[in-house]
UniProtKB/Swiss-Prot annotation:
PROSITE patterns: RIBOSOMAL_S19. NCBIfam families: rpsS_bact. Keywords: Ribonucleoprotein, Ribosomal protein, RNA-binding, rRNA-binding. Gene3D superfamilies: 30s Ribosomal Protein S19, Chain A (3.30.860.10). HAMAP family: Ribosomal_uS19. The keyword Transferase does not apply. Protein S19 forms a complex with S13 that binds strongly to the 16S ribosomal RNA. GO terms for biological process: ribosomal small subunit assembly; translation. This is Small ribosomal subunit protein uS19. It comes from Mycoplasmopsis synoviae (strain 53).
Length: 92
């Protein structure tokens, strides 16, 4: 279910402050470390790199135009697929 249009997109305030500091030139342009997977990607984020936490480690995500409107967590998978169990009788 989509978010209501009257509410608008969501992004954490601390994340927006970090992005604004980089845009204004007050902070060095390095990956922005964040745990906020729920934040929506805004057009201001294009060209920046975010280090998004997946529960175990930080995965670097470079934001492009196609990612605008999606959430940061969509580009940092939390689960690893190790394959289905192999049938031992078929191997012989």
């Amino acid at each position: 279910m989509a978010r209501s249009l009257k509410k608008g997109p969501f992004a954490d305030d601390h994340l927006l402050k970090k992005v604004q500091a980089i845009i204004d030139g007050k902070a060095p342009k390095k990956p922005i470390k964040t745990w906020s997977r729920r934040s929506t990607i805004f057009p201001d984020f294009v060209g920046l790199t975010f280090a998004v936490h997946n529960g175990k480690q930080f995965i670097e995500v470079y934001v492009t135009d196609d990612m605008v409107g999606h959430k940061l967590g969509e580009f940092s998978p939390t689960r690893t697929f190790s394959g289905h169990g192999a049938d031992k009788s078929k191997k012989k």
